[in-house]
């Protein structure tokens, strides 16, 4: 395709792999770049050629002709050179250029910034969480109120999300807060921070309004015409003849809006302080914003320009102590533009700002910086000038304006880019896996159920460490999606050699993979099989729930059916000796009945017999049939009675605990205080996170960086009814804090897919925006059920014996959904740590991807609290959709390594190089349970014992840790405590310098 010659000046073709072809785009004027020679003369330099390079380092062949609204220089990576962010309107992509220090620019790598605003209006920079890294904020036009959103249309084109695609940079109609990770990449955290929606926003500025040491955010809003008004668009669309542009604009209402002040409360959390600070008290069309100290009191005031109205000056009345800084630079840079100023006060985090000129939307601020000092007398100011030299002022007085002259600067100072000096605990060893990539064939979930919030066809894979060939080294086994094959990556002491299962590619997804001893020796791999993509209920009933892959001579044989087909597709599997006969029994968790989400599905327990078969357990069938839609499951002895209890994570329900009384299960969720913590839980594991000898529960959910929010008093609800052939009717609802009514969260066009008469009943988008759930459902309102979530936080449930206490994991861990979760002592300090596998991309088409995670390592403090490791501290960066995660010491060095699977992308391996070496425990169990599944281990040091660890098969989101357990080994360790399934205990002495110990169960 090509544009006809007559139109090439107005239009261009853009290649869009995400749309499977090319699109026509309107051209704007090209952006202009001018170099100052220092003598008052500027020379235009084309934004192409050798000075401007693309992400791969190739020169731009043509100058960008995007609809640019703002451009701003700021040194984002601390190398002393000004980088450049260019804000582009409509669907033109923003351009983020890094300066090479020689005046050349290169676009940031594709994966450095995963999501941006769609119609970017302005940009500003600040270190919002005071971690010494520069964060980036851009504005767009998403309304903060549900009612306004429901009567407007979106400006961005909803794009299909391809399986495994991570390198594209999606654009979404919302503000973006790019939170710097410190490794040259950013995590989009606007929802997480509470800054995603400020209305039709133009200028924005970071400024510490209340002088508490954290920069707050001011955003100005409004537009002459609300051209996103859906009713206006419909009126124009129904007109038979063309409408002149000036009359067309008259179809749209004026959009006057209040400007917004967002107070930075720390920890990447902003709250609306507009009313408290008397900012934006009236509705107007405000576009420009600038900062200056108009009254000389050392606090920055604000000037806002408005369309068709006089400008407004807001006087800052904060009385908190501060210092103001102006710079006198060497000619010709007399204002010291590009210099970085840092203020350190004893009771506040270090504050840094760069002296900049212009760059706001059609605006620029005065060259004065203001910093909080609290009541400290110890205040230092340092300036790193553009040429690298430094000026230092020690123990300055508060409440003063300091003008600092470059003439007194000292020799060149190092760049200020913050670095974590500690060596990362992990290094990337993925290359050892031979390039294994998870395969997941595309499936259109939304044809069958149009109102699904997320795809259910891209939930895998799980990953397990299993010694498949019996050579003493644990191998990696990864599930597959339809069209792929079960992957066995054999550990050959230095690299992993892939072995493929025999037969054709899998017809259905293989979920959890677990080992059981085969009759006559060897291993059988049990694989959960999902029938979710079956074309009909009848077809689903021909899909075996569990397959068995016998392993012969290191190679897997053809699969055989282990468990009969069921109506529900399978997700999690878990193994334990539930009835005390010495054989491992199998729990099969129901994920969903195809086409009926979120209706519950029955799970099942299969007992193993002495001849190696699995038979359905009837004693617990009724109890297991009502557990709901299970995302994950594991067995663990929570009460220390020697019998494995069952813990399950469900969608739209609590984490449930079923107590095992000699093979009979009883749901004790309510008794343990867990019933009120409902969520769309994903993964779960257990670990002794406070070192008290009791296993705690860790459950992953969707985090705090999505459009969803929930609390006990305002749950996020799903109203469910029966809509016939297209599955259950779904209405996502939440109580509106303003009206007190339960309001639908879905836009009218989407909800109308399931309620055909809704358009007629509503009559207009404006009317629909005011309708409650009962009004939307009409006569069907009484024939519905409600399920809900009270939290979306990843949560630690501390075991107190007769109850569990809920504690949200650190806020930094909530920046993305998590699935896989591993509890292990990664640093070897004797305190259990956690790892979370993060991200979820296959949301419904109009919802952004949830991909701000990179895999989160949490170092345990030993009391149930954690330190969230940065990417530099952990060494882990997994930017795709993490699913299963499992730990093992694959190279036998006494450190816990990590394997993480990704949906539709490469399986990753992380080698632990910095943890303290621990004790490797090899259990030799009975014939029916050779790995000792269910055994608990603790290190004994005099009268003290370390955290308890249990050998388990299943959990961690469809996964299994290695059975060779690594325990931290303190210098005074004397013995290993082992409690086998059913409660028999052993104390095994540890010799000085011993690093491996073998414990054999009594025969």
Question: What spans do the regions from the language model cover?
Answer:
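Beta-rich catalytic cores
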Residues: 29, 67, 92, 119-121, ...
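Short, conserved, GDST-rich strand-edge loop motifs in beta-rich repeat architectures
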Residues: 1-26, 143-169, 223-254, 528-542, ...
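Solenoidal tandem-repeat scaffolds enriched in leucines and small polar residues
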Residues: 1-80, 87-89, 567-607, 612-636, ...
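Acidic/hydrophobic-patterned starts of short beta strands in beta-sheet-rich repeat architectures
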Residues: 1, 78-87, 132-139, 212-220, ...
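Surface-exposed loop and turn segments in beta-propeller and other repeat-based domains
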Residues: 46-62, 110-113, 191-194, 275-280, ...
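Beta-propeller blade repeat segments, especially FG-GAP/WD-type strand-to-loop junctions
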Residues: 8-11, 15, 28-45, 93-108, ...
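Beta-propeller blade termini
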Residues: 35, 68-76, 98, 120-130, ...
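Gly/Ser/Thr/Pro-enriched helix-cap/hinge segments flanking short amphipathic alpha-helices
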Residues: 185, 252-462, 496, 525, ...
């Amino acid at each position: 395709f090509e544009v006809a010659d007559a139109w090439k000046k107005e239009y261009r073709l853009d290649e869009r792999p995400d749309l499977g072809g090319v699109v026509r785009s309107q051209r704007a004027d090209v952006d202009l770049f001018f170099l100052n020679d220092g003598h008052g003369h500027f020379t235009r330099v084309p934004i192409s050629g050798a000075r401007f390079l693309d992400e791969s380092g190739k020169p731009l062949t043509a100058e960008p002709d995007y609809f640019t609204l703002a451009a701003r220089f700021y040194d984002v990576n601390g190398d002393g050179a000004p980088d450049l962010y260019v804000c582009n309107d409509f669907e033109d992509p923003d351009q983020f250029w890094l300066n090479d220090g020689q005046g050349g620019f290169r676009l940031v790598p594709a994966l450095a910034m995963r999501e941006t605003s769609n119609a970017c209006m302005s940009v500003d920079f600040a270190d919002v969480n005071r971690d010494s890294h520069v964060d980036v904020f851009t504005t767009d036009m998403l309304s903060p109120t549900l009612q306004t959103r429901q009567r407007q249309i979106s400006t961005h084109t909803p794009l299909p999300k391809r399986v495994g695609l991570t390198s594209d940079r999606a654009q979404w109609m919302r503000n973006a807060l790019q939170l710097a990770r410190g490794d040259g990449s950013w995590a989009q955290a606007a929802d997480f921070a509470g800054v995603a929606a400020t209305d039709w926003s133009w200028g924005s500025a970071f400024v510490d309004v209340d002088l508490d040491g954290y920069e707050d955010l001011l955003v100005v809003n409004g537009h002459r015409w609300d051209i996103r008004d859906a009713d206006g668009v419909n009126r124009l669309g129904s007109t038979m003849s063309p409408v002149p542009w000036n009359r067309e604009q008259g179809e749209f209402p004026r959009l006057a809006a209040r400007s917004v002040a967002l107070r930075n409360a720390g920890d990447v959390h902003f709250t609306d302080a507009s009313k408290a600070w008397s900012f934006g008290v009236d509705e107007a069309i405000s576009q420009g914003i600038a900062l200056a100290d108009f009254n000389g009191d050392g606090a920055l005031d604000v000037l806002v320009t408005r369309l068709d109205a006089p400008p407004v000056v807001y006087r800052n009345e904060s009385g908190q102590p501060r210092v103001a800084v102006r710079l006198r630079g060497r000619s010709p840079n007399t204002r010291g533009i590009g210099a970085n100023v840092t203020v350190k006060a004893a009771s506040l985090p270090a504050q840094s700002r760069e002296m900049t000129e212009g760059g706001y939307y059609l605006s620029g601020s005065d060259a004065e910086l203001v910093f909080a000092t609290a009541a400290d007398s110890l205040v230092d100011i340092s300036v790193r000038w553009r040429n690298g030299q430094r000026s230092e002022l020690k123990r300055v007085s508060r409440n003063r304006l300091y003008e600092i002259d470059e003439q007194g600067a000292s020799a060149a100072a190092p760049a200020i880019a913050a670095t974590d000096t500690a060596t990362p605990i992990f290094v990337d060893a993925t290359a050892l896996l031979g390039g294994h990539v998870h395969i997941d064939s595309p499936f259109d979930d939304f044809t069958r159920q149009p109102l699904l919030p997320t795809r259910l066809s891209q939930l895998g894979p799980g990953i397990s460490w299993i010694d498949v060939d019996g050579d003493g080294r644990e191998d990696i086994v990864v599930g597959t999606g339809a069209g792929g094959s079960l992957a066995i990556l054999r550990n050959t002491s230095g690299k992993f050699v892939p072995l493929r299962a025999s037969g054709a590619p899998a017809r259905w997804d293989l979920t959890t993979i677990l080992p059981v001893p085969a009759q006559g020796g060897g291993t059988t791999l049990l694989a959960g099989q999902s029938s979710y993509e079956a074309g009909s209920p009848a077809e689903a009933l021909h899909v075996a729930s569990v397959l068995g892959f016998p392993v012969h001579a290191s190679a897997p044989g053809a699969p055989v059916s282990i468990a009969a087909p069921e109506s529900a597709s399978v997700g999690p599997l878990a193994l334990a000796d539930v009835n005390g006969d010495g054989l491992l029994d199998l729990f099969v968790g129901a994920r969903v009945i195809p086409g009926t989400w979120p209706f519950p599905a029955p799970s099942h327990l299969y007992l193993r017999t002495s001849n190696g078969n699995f038979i359905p357990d009837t004693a617990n069938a009724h109890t297991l049939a009502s557990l709901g839609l299970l995302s994950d499951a594991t067995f663990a002895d929570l009460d220390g009675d020697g019998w494995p209890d069952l813990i399950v994570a469900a969608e739209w329900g609590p984490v449930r605990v079923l107590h095992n009384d000699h093979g009979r299960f009883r749901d004790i969720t309510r008794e343990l205080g867990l019933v009120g913590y409902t969520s769309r839980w994903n993964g779960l594991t257990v670990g002794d996170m406070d070192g008290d000898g009791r296993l705690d529960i860790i459950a992953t959910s969707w985090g705090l960086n999505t459009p969803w929010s929930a609390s006990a008093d305002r749950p996020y609800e799903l109203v469910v009814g029966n809509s016939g052939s297209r599955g259950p009717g779904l209405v996502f609802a939440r109580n509106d804090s303003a009206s007190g009514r339960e309001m639908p969260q879905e836009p009218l066009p989407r909800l109308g897919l399931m309620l055909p008469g809704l358009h007629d009943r509503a009559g207009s988008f404006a009317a629909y925006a005011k309708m409650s759930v009962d009004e939307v459902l009409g006569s069907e309102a009484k024939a519905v059920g409600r399920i809900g979530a009270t939290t979306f936080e990843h949560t630690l449930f501390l075991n107190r014996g007769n109850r569990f206490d809920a504690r949200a994991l650190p806020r930094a861990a909530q920046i993305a959904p998590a699935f896989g979760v591993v509890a292990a002592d990664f640093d070897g300090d004797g305190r259990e740590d956690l790892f979370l596998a993060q991200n979820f991309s296959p949301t419904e088409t109009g919802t952004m991807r949830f991909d701000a995670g990179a895999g989160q390592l949490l170092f345990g403090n030993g009391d149930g609290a954690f330190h969230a490791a940065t990417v530099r501290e952990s060494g882990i960066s997994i930017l795709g959709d993490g699913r299963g995660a499992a730990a093992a010491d694959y190279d036998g060095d006494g450190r816990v390594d990590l394997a993480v699977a990704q949906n539709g992308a490469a399986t990753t391996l992380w080698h632990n190089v910095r943890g303290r070496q621990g004790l490797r425990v090899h259990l030799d169990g009975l014939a029916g349970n050779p790995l000792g599944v269910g055994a608990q281990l603790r290190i004994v040091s005099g009268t003290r014992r370390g955290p308890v660890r249990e050998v388990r098969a299943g959990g961690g989101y469809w996964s299994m840790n290695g059975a060779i357990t690594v325990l931290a080994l303190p210098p005074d360790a004397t013995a290993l405590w082992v409690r086998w399934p059913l409660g028999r205990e052993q104390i095994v002495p540890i010799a000085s310098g011993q690093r491996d110990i073998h414990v054999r169960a009594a025969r």
